[in-house]
Regions:
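Tryptophan-paired
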Residues: 44-80
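Bacterial Sec-dependent N-terminal signal peptides
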Residues: 6-30
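Generic short beta-strand segments
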Residues: 27-31, 82-88
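Structured interaction patches on ligand/partner-binding surfaces of diverse proteins
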Residues: 14, 86-126
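Solvent-exposed loop and beta-edge segments used for protein-protein assembly and interaction
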Residues: 18-20, 73-77, 112-114
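Sec-dependent signal peptide recognition
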Residues: 1-3
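Structural motif
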Residues: 27-42
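Intrinsic-disorder/low-complexity, polar/charged segments enriched in Ser/Thr/Lys/Arg/Asp/Glu/Gln
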Residues: 23-25, 67-69, 78, 104-106, ...
Length: 126
């Protein structure tokens, strides 16, 4: 009984306010196409498509972008982000696209806030 009471009391510890995760909103644009982005499906099976934590080397799948936006929950840290995908634009065009802006340790991005927003500029692949 004493053990159960101590578990209950310890389980009610007040939140320290220190969240180890960040909710990251990813917004994509494609300046070379005048139409807006409706959807981007990332090919997570490719070696070049990743969200990678530089400290732990853990990789996360990149979600599908709806109306140019996707959200992912990541442990706070430093990340490399790169991906190839298929974009559908508001005028019906379909194109292969790439984001490689944070594809190396030298160009990585630091995500330390509880909420982060990244604006990613896509390149159309030929």
């Amino acid at each position: 009984m004493l053990l159960m009471l101590s578990v209950v009391l310890c389980g009610c510890e007040k939140d320290s306010g220190q969240n180890v995760f960040s909710i990251v909103t990813l917004n994509v644009t494609c300046p070379s196409v005048s139409a807006g982005i409706e959807r981007v499906e990332v090919d997570n099976s490719l070696d070049g498509s990743f969200i990678r934590d530089l400290n732990t080397r853990q990789e996360y799948d990149i979600p599908t972008f709806q109306v140019g936006t996707a959200t992912v929950k990541l442990r706070k840290g430093i990340y490399m982000i790169s991906f190839d995908g298929k974009a559908v634009f508001s005028d019906g065009q379909r194109k292969k696209v790439r984001f490689a802006g944070y594809n190396s340790p030298m160009t990585s991005v630091t995500l330390l806030n509880d909420k982060e927003t990244l604006n990613l500029e896509l390149t159309v692949l030929k």
